[in-house]
Amino acid sequence: MRWRWRHGAERYEDARVTSNPPLGTRTLGRAGLRVATLGLGCMGMSQGYGAADRDESIATVHRALDLGVTFLDTSDVYGDGHNEELVGEAIAGRRGEVQLATKFSLSRGDAGMVLDGRPENVRACAEASLRRLRVDVIDLYYQHRVDPRVPIEDTVGAMAELVQQGKVRFLGLSEASAASIRRAVAVHPIAALQSEWSLWTRDLEMAGGGAAGEDTVLGVAREHGIGIVPFSPLGRGFLTGAITTPDDFAADDFRRGHPRFTGDAFAANLRLVDAVRGMAEEKGCTPGQLALAWVLAQGDDVVPIPGTKRRAYLEENVGAAALELSAEDLARLAAIAPPGAAEGGRYADAAYAYGDSPERGAR
């Protein structure tokens, strides 16, 4: 089978799974948050991946709801609030169809990103998000990153008060360590853990997210009945096979400075994608669909949230739900992309992956 590129060399056009059967739902957490099997990450509609067309972004959200992709993910830091406003506008009149997730604790300061998990900030951020989203309740409220200065018990305690007040339905953590998860669930049930997980980022499966002598973050989350919400399940677009050179990125695309998209790491990671591409051709799907199907196959407690700001890419992603991977397929993919296979760090040093907080009373 021959592959043909769309204009702009962005996605494969042939051999794409295009049937879109009903997505169904999955459950996050023991408390029973039912969400669509596949979510939509909305960040790129406001930042990170070059310019976005507002009308196309809103149309993408509407198309997502039409296709049953009703689990929408945003954050107060995306576009400094713009993303929440955009999502709020897009879901106006369709709120009943949506499972809405947003996050707090990250903001931009003069010297870079600022973390704030203080209880008073939890409350202030929630009120601001409710206003921007134009809703009365947030279905899933995450701490975006663990604040290393504030005991997580204090942060989650303030989040739990929002549940008691009816402003939030379920609580989540993002990029938290195994130890932080254990401390958080002692305060209030956690429905979901959001973390990067894909064929080229399998740190979640590694001890301590990569540190020796610790439990896996994935194992601890599952021990406590916490659902997994993988972000960047397509490797920030790399696993679609569309990116062949750093010049494919717009000038304001953050991937230009990402460790895995620069220098020797870029060339090494292209070889991984080439192997995925070859298998996808055999399966009659795109590389991105195969990569996304692998994430979906990791368990019924897994709900990936691939991001896009275009309807065409959304529809391609939804097609991944129609793919069935055999045990042999999964074994082949595991051999192609074992944990640690990708070259380069997944974050810059200041990104607070798998964060910890101080013990209460510590100085």
Pin down the residues of each PLM region.
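Conserved beta-strand positions
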Residues: L40-C42, T74, L140-Q143, L173, ...
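Alpha-helix N-cap and loop-to-helix initiation/capping positions
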Residues: A52-E56, H82, L86, M113-A124, ...
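Structural motif
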Residues: R63, L67, R132-L133, G166, ...
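Beta/alpha (TIM)-barrel catalytic core signal, keyed to glycine-rich beta->alpha loops juxtaposed to Asp/Glu
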Residues: G8, P22, V146, V150-I336, ...
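N-terminal binding-site loop/beta-alpha segment at the start of enzyme catalytic domains
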Residues: R2-Q99, R360-R363
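A short acidic, helix-capping loop that chelates divalent metal ions and anchors anionic groups
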Residues: G44-Y49, S107-M113, D203-L204, Y313-E316
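Active-site groove signature of glycoside hydrolases
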Residues: L130-P148
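Short, acidic/polar
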Residues: A52-A64, G117-L133, S177-R182
